[in-house]
Amino acid sequence: DEIYRAKQDKPELEVKILIDWHRAQRNLLGAEKSATNADWYCEQRQKYQLADDPNLFFGVPINTREVFGVLHIKGFVFDDTVLYSGASINNVYLQQNEKYRYDRYQKITHSQLADSMVAFIRDFLLNSDVVLPLDSVNRPKTKEIRQNIRHFRKNLALNGQYKLSSAVDFGNELTVTPLFGLGGAGNVLNCTIEDLFQLVDEKLTICTPYFNFPRTLQQKIRHLLRKGKKIEIIVGDKVAND
């Protein structure tokens, strides 16, 4: 509701929210079969009379795994501020209705980094014939665009990249480099993670929701242990988080 109110109060505000195409069209928990998140977006759009405005919610048909399993991380760009978190924007994480779930947040204020992420969204996601509005009643069925989805994923895996002249330097202790990777072959993100394993001097700390590492990483961990390096693995626990 807050997003729609903000758009209603300030029509010139640019709002684009990208969500998993498949998950957004599943049934809401405990709701009848016809009710999905996408249906709710349409209802809210009609409620706040935004019919003539650009769409706010878009579905991205990518549901694949990264090197450490499914990476449930969310990215937000507010003007020149980038916010990364494992949390969703919902009542539980915002401590509404007497419930609160803790998560981690990284807040980075840097105009070039924010611009590079917005440019990536515009160039590689919104500029596609399969990243479609979810707050529209005229949504195609997934099977109708399946061939286009395969082409989209292949093209994104081959060409997707952030356009930033150099890493964002925040002093001696922190440098931020946006990397994109999709799929198994030539995945820059996965390759970079594996290469970092080779640079450990004393200790490696891994934060991961899963413990089933790919075989290549298992081999690298064994190699580090044989060389006497310390390895700390922090595994997410749902009960503890809740």
Residue ranges and their predicted role:
Residues D1-W40, L50-D53, F57, P61-K74, ...:
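Charged, low-complexity intrinsically disordered terminal segments
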